[in-house]
Amino acid sequence: MTQEIRRRNEPLLVGGMYGQGTSHYLVTEHLDGFLFPAVHLRRQDGYELDAVGAALYDTQRGVEIQWDYSLHGRFVPET
């Protein structure tokens, strides 16, 4: 039996930590200039990306962040 993946009606908060699979992403800022909600994310290993269409979803693994597509993905050393 498959479980439906459903979008949650909850905002992504700056400073919030959200999981996706085995990774965790920190929301560092909301981005302007996109048709869909976009946020800048930082993963624990230093990888950063801009996630467009980002939202929280109920999945088989629990609540996860997902997005439509990403831009500007890169590793950024901590300062």
Per-region residue spans from a language model:
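Intrinsically disordered, low-complexity regions enriched in serine, threonine, proline
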Residues: 3-5, 40, 58, 71
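Basic/aromatic-rich interaction segments and small domains that mediate binding to polyanionic partners
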Residues: 28-55
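Intrinsically disordered, low-complexity, charged/polar segments
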Residues: 48-79
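Short, hydrophobic/aromatic-rich segments at coil-to-beta transitions
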Residues: 12-17, 36-37
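Short coil-to-beta-strand transition motifs
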Residues: 18-24
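Mixed-charge, Lys/Arg-rich low-complexity intrinsically disordered regions
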Residues: 1-13
